Structures are given as structure tokens and as C-alpha cells.
């Protein structure tokens, strides 16, 4: 698979398949952030969730590299950067 194909696949997953399975990506990451914050007794942002999910995928790559991990990391990176874009427009 070429770089563009990986990125296209990640974009399709983030905007299509996963959104259908799990609902709106922003709401999902906000829900995860609330749960992790309550469990850890430490404030976690939705942006933090996306970064931590990339780290989870990186840990899995250490065991066995798969295309899916790289594609998922690209998807989480896109979500993470979209949070920085959203924050820029809030100020």
C-alpha cells in the first residue's frame, strides 16, 4: 500500500465505518475522556485520548507490526489535530 492509500483508508474509517459503529468521534472521545478522568482522578481531555490511543497502537506495533495499527494511528492523529483546530477557533 502506498502512503496516499494508507491516509485515504484512515480517512474513510474515521469519517465512515468507525463513525457508524461508535457514533460521532468527538462525542466518543469526550465520553472516554470523562471516564478516564473519573477513574484516574486527573483531568484528561479528548485530545489526550486521541494521543493515548496512538500510544496504545505504538505499543501494539512493538509486539507485531500490522497495517491496521498504522492506519489507526493515522486516524487518531487526524482526530488529535482536529482538536487543536477546534481549540484555535474557540479563542
Regions found by a protein language model. Give the residues of each.
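Short, compact, well-ordered microdomains
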Residues: 64-83
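Conserved small/polar residues in nucleotide/adenosyl-binding loops
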Residues: 84-91
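Short, contiguous, well-structured surface segments enriched in hydrophobic/aromatic residues
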Residues: 25-63
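Compositionally biased, intrinsically disordered low-complexity segments
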Residues: 16-17, 54, 82-84
